[in-house]
Amino acid sequence: MGLLFVELLPRHGDGGGPASAVLKCRRCRVDAASADAILSRDFRGRFGRAYLFDHVVNISLGPNEDRYLMTGLHTVKDIYCSCCQQILGWRYEKAYEESEKYKEGKFILEKARMWKEAR
C-alpha cells in the first residue's frame, strides 16, 4: 500500500470571499465536503439527518448494493473516510424510479458522522 493522499478543501469561498465551513470526518477530522456545496438538507440516513452533495473528497467506495430506501429501490455504494475507514454515507449509483434519477452519481453524508469546522 502506498502513501495516503489527502485533499484539503480551499480555505476561502469562490473569488476570495468569506471563508466557508468545511464538513470533516467526525472520527479523524479529515476534510470531506464544503458546507457551501450542500445540494439538499432534506435527506435521512441510518443515523438521522443527512445531506446531498455533488462532490466529496477523501473517501473510498464500497461495492454496489441494492437497498430499499424511503424513496424506493436504489443501487448504492457505501462511502468510507479514506483515512480512518469510518462509514460516512453512500453514493447513489442507480435509481429505479424516474423521479429519483437526479440522485445518480451524488453523495449522501450523514450529519452524525460529520464535524463542522468554521473557517
Swiss-Prot record:
Residues 21-118 form the Yippee domain. Keywords: Metal-binding, Zinc. Signal peptide: none annotated. Disulfide bonds: none annotated. Pfam families: Yippee-Mis18. Coiled coil: none annotated. The keyword Zinc applies. InterPro entries: Yippee (IPR034751), Yippee/Mis18/Cereblon (IPR004910), Yippee_fam (IPR039058). GO terms for molecular function: metal ion binding. Zn(2+) binds at residues 25, 28, 81, 84. Belongs to the yippee family. This is Putative yippee-like protein Os10g0369500. It comes from Oryza sativa subsp. japonica (Rice).
